[in-house]
Design a protein with these regions (language model features):
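Amphipathic, non-transmembrane alpha-helical segments in extracytoplasmic/periplasmic proteins
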Residues: 91-92, 264, 289-293
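C-terminal "post-core" interaction segments
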Residues: 1-245
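Alpha-helix C-terminal capping/helix-coil junction sites
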Residues: 44, 94, 265, 325-326
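Short proline/glycine- and basic residue-enriched helix-capping loop/turn segments at helix->loop/beta transitions
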Residues: 267-269
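Feature responds to low-complexity, polar/acidic, surface-exposed segments characteristic
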Residues: 223-256, 271-287, 294-319, 326-338
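Conserved "repeat-terminator" motif of extracellular CCP/Sushi domains
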Residues: 132-136, 292, 320
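Active-site nucleophilic cysteine motif
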Residues: 85-86, 286, 290
Length: 338
């Protein structure tokens, strides 16, 4: 189709000039599943790229037999309006390891529809009438669905800064001395020029990038002849990024779950106590569990009356409890109470 031709033409025309690719899917509401699979295969090559599940629970596998047109990594930009087939493209990039996703969590429409009209069912529809029916839920190669949950980007940043963050990651590998560069090992190897990143034009994006780095991702600073591990906070201080704020918590270092807690914080799922602490040894109430699950699952905000007599929709946890209950993940204690 036209989408795949666009990607093919771009990669073939500029392939000898580019060592990074950026696909901006911010505000892209999706389209045809086949187009998303064909487009992402220009980066990933042959293999399975999606599974579609119908109402009977049967799965169909979809993929490509074509070879990749580039070995350079791709950066996908996403926001809350990146939806449907665009989310499949982003999740394919994530699961195949051919690049990273930058921006905010996507919309969460992981279903496909068919259209019944006079062409597909002549005699049943006329005068331009048609009916659209949701028939499939799709899953990425790794087995996860984007439906409701959406795609959580590798680097969770303000979508308005996503393009500038991507540009910072497009610095070429240093030739000779590594001094003045950062190296980021995250799905692929990325380089950041400190001169560019510290400039007034890119300081906000650089700050956002450092804040978004999750635990376990290796950040290194050039020493001239080699690389040395460095913490994002140390880089921010050295570069005078006064607006930098770590998303981690001050009281998790001694916890056996510290890395997991801080990773959830990096992706905006765990918010802690509001004062920079998490209280990792504390107990979790049922309401707090629902709040955590609702955030992790990207639950839709419920409307109407609460299904529990002791939970008001005006309570800070009211919408979360009702959203998670609507999914069947929690139940009340009986008598209409939670």
């Amino acid at each position: 189709g036209e989408t795949v031709e666009h990607f093919t033409d771009g990669l073939e025309t500029y392939g000898d000039q580019a060592d990074r690719w950026i696909v901006d899917l911010r505000g892209n509401g999706g389209g045809v599943v086949d187009a998303a699979i064909g487009a992402v295969s220009t980066f990933s090559g042959s293999g399975l790229l999606a599974y579609l599940k119908d109402s009977d629970g049967s799965y169909g596998a979809f993929g490509s037999n074509d070879e990749a047109l580039t070995t350079a990594p791709v950066i996908v930009l996403a926001d809350e309006n990146t939806a449907s087939a665009s989310e499949l493209f982003a999740s394919d990039v994530r699961d195949t390891g051919v690049g990273i996703v930058i921006g905010s969590r996507s919309f969460g429409k992981g279903v496909a529809q068919i259209v019944l009209d006079e062409n597909s069912l002549p005699g049943y529809f006329d005068n331009g009438d048609a009916m659209k029916i949701t028939t499939y839920r799709f899953y990425a190669p790794g087995g996860g669905t984007t439906d409701t949950v959406g795609v959580i980007p590798h680097l969770l940043v303000d979508p308005d800064l996503a393009d500038e963050v991507a540009v910072l990651l497009c610095s070429p590998a240093p030739e000779g001395s590594t001094e003045g560069y950062l190296r980021l090992d995250f799905n692929r190897v990325w380089y950041i020029s400190l001169e560019q990143a510290s400039s007034p034009e890119y300081q906000a994006a650089f700050t956002a990038l450092l804040e978004a780095l999750p635990v376990g991702v290796t950040l290194q600073s050039g020493t001239g002849s080699s690389w040395a591990a460095v913490e994002p906070a140390a880089v921010a201080e050295a570069c005078g990024l006064t607006g930098y704020q770590s998303r981690g918590f001050s009281d998790t270092a001694g916890s056996p779950y510290a890395s997991l807690i801080d990773r959830l914080a990096a992706y905006g799922i765990a918010s802690g106590s509001g004062d920079g602490t998490y209280n990792p040894e504390g107990s979790l109430t049922r309401a707090e569990l629902c709040a955590l699950l609702a955030k992790a699952l990207n639950c839709r905000v419920p409307t109407g009356e609460s299904r529990f007599t002791d939970v008001s929709m005006d309570d800070w946890y009211g919408m979360c409890v009702n959203a998670v209950a609507a999914l069947g993940l929690v139940e009340g204690v009986g008598g209409g109470r939670f």
